[in-house]
Amino acid sequence: SYTFSSNEAGTITFGGSCSSSDNSSINGNNTITFNALSDDTYSDCTITVTDNASNASNALSVNTFVVDTTGPTVAEVTAVTTPGNDTTPSYTFSSSETGTITYGGSCSSSDTSADADNNTIDFNTLSVATYGDCTIRVTDTSGNPSNLLLVSSFTIETTPPTVSSVYPTDNQSRISISTDNISVTFSESMDNSSVTTNASN
């Protein structure tokens, strides 16, 4: 809608890209509704009022305005490292527009502004658990919401592994270095590259 004032009643004529079924003006403020417009920037719309004596007003130039009915598109860029021991993990997603971020599910963050680019946010402190319900949505400056982005499931685990059994046992005798295998059992699955050993006589 658009409001303008006229000092006489008359017939409204529209110019440029805008039109309306509201074609009668009163002496005073008039609020009209433009016919449907496509998403775009409009700077050429004009309004003229012609009175009963066929005298035309000046052509009123409507201030430039933007019609935007399309929400941003958001997508995951870098998932949360899983499993991980960071209770405030970072997450990167992309947005096609600037806007305000809202969070859903178990996750939240103090990062609430999105750029039209990649965005890295830090989730607020999370407990040890697996999270598969976290969502992110970006709403642009026109109030259009993005698609709902489901964050890939991740696990936070802060308890270090323990050794549950060792062969040979401590101080065990009659062990052959050449034929006996040394085995260690841990309380959980291990990253082999992170396991180190020390040997001493």
What is the predicted function of each stretch?
Residues 2-3, 9-22, 90-92, 98-111, ...:
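Short, surface-exposed alpha-helix to beta-strand junction/turn motifs within ectodomains of secreted
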Residues 24-33, 113-122:
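Aromatic sugar-binding surface patches on proteins
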Residues 33-43, 122-132:
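Surface-exposed, short loops/turns at beta-strand junctions within beta-sandwich domains
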Residues 43-46, 90, 132-135:
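Short, conserved beta-strand segments of beta-strand-rich sandwich/propeller modules, principally
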Residues 49-51, 138-140:
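Conserved structural position at the C-terminal beta-strand
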Residues 53-59, 142-148:
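Short, exposed coil/turn segments at beta-strand boundaries within extracellular/luminal domains
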Residues 61-72, 150-164:
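Flexible, low-complexity linkers/stalks enriched in Thr/Pro that connect modular domains
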Residues 81-87, 172-178:
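Short, solvent-exposed loop/linker segments at the N-terminal edge
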